[in-house]
């Protein structure tokens, strides 16, 4: 009897390919004979002999699946979409990461610049890419601004993307023309309150991280100042040096050379602590507004993909950012490592978006 059952069981296993469907309950492989010395009733024996063809047939399928190795990742070239023009900070971040990532993965890493629409053009490319982790997008604060400032985005910021990590961050500088009679946040606030609505602050765009930082500063200190947007950081800096705007709210990379040369006066940085590039310029937080922080940052996201792939990308970017040559390159741009886990970065993106939504709706700001 035992021999007969063994033959039948082997036959069932060999018929796995003929199974019509997967089992609707957990797979069981049951020996229908009691162990020696074990008293089994006829009812129990009947249950033990109830072996379904479907249960037995699926076992070799599962074993075969378990023995097949997972497809390696990445299995082709990686793409990094930088939704900014060549030569800018985001482009530098992408290209600086590309070399160590290429070495780590043994694949080419191609950087593509796709500027336009406040980074929405590049984001759309990634949103439509295969959900396999092979196409990354370098994002900045504008990624968390667009959902509320641009009507009818061709993607869903919070459903179509998954955070990999924040990569680096840098401070934003509040600077004034040397002719303005202020040398501190306290003096700037006093002057602005004495002349409500007269002082202006220039930014690199109508609605980006610098504009948000300027509005957060205005709100925190309780003054009325007017934004003057420019098409880029260079013209905004030039306007401030020429006295066409009262203040400049700009990335430390763009404004630090002018502050160090005395062509602009640094009033404060928006990081929690002083920036290494401008160690003599205090933070807003230490100038009487504890906890104030408004950073410029760059991170990496992919189209929503399996968690193991995202974690692998995260691990390699974290390793890359700690390499001395990468740190040096980032430091030359005034940027410091600011990495996170994928889950923390997703939460950070949502927190930034929630804050930006409040500012945008309060001021009724739009990007047409």
Mark where each language-model region is.
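Positively charged n-region of N-terminal signal peptides that target proteins for export
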Residues: 1-4
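Bacterial N-terminal signal peptides
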Residues: 6-16, 57
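N-terminal (or domain-start) structured segment
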Residues: 20-159, 198, 222-251, 258, ...
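An extracytoplasmic/periplasmic, membrane-proximal ligand-sensing/linker region
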Residues: 22-26, 61, 75-77, 220, ...
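Hinge/capping helix and adjacent helix->loop/strand transition within the periplasmic-binding protein
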Residues: 128-134, 148-235, 284-286, 295-329
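Beta->alpha turn/N-cap motifs
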Residues: 138-143, 203, 232-233, 250-255, ...
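A ligand-binding cleft/hinge motif common to bilobed small-molecule-binding domains
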Residues: 143-152, 211, 216-220, 246-281, ...
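C-terminal lobe and pocket-closing loops
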Residues: 255-322, 351-354
